[in-house]
Amino acid sequence: MSQDSKVFFRIFLGIGLVLILISVVVFYNQFTYSKDAIHTEGVIVDTVWHSSHSHRTGKDGSWYPVVAFRPTPDYTLIFNSSIGSDFYEDSEGDKVNVYYSPGHPEKAEINNPWVNFFKWGFIGIMGVIFIAVGLLISMPSSKKSRRKRKSRP
């Protein structure tokens, strides 16, 4: 393995391990938050279009659901979701899972497994890719290793 290959391998391995570590920490924090949170059912009562660029018109944006749920039987709380998607465009009346920290229903979020996976999964996948690229860089090519073996007495 050449000196350059060793340096690149170490850089890619280091970045990959850091990304995997971040992924594990995000997963653990999300798992413990979800485990300790209060889970309930909410209803999408409205959707709001937010454009990603205020000066443009057209399709650059997403639909954000407005969700109503009952933290107590006599109190209905309504919140705007921070997660938007075209999926929510015609979703008024749909039921969604909602979760929030005990004592803080005003900080409720939609419990979407795909969004939750994306928070830690994307970072972890990038870490695995960095490690794989580092391993590929560090592997000697078959032609180089054959030449070295033939040239040795």
Swiss-Prot record:
InterPro entries: DUF3592. The keyword Transmembrane helix applies. It is found in: Cell inner membrane. Residues 1-6, 138-153 are cytoplasmic. Residues 28-116 are periplasmic. Keywords: Cell inner membrane, Cell membrane, Membrane, Transmembrane, Transmembrane helix. It is a multi-pass membrane protein. The keyword Thylakoid does not apply. GO terms for biological process: bacterial-type flagellum-dependent swarming motility. GO terms for cellular component: plasma membrane. The chain crosses the membrane at residues 7-27, 117-137. It comes from the Bacteria. Its main location: membrane. This is Inner membrane protein YmfA. It comes from Escherichia coli (strain K12). The gene is ymfA.
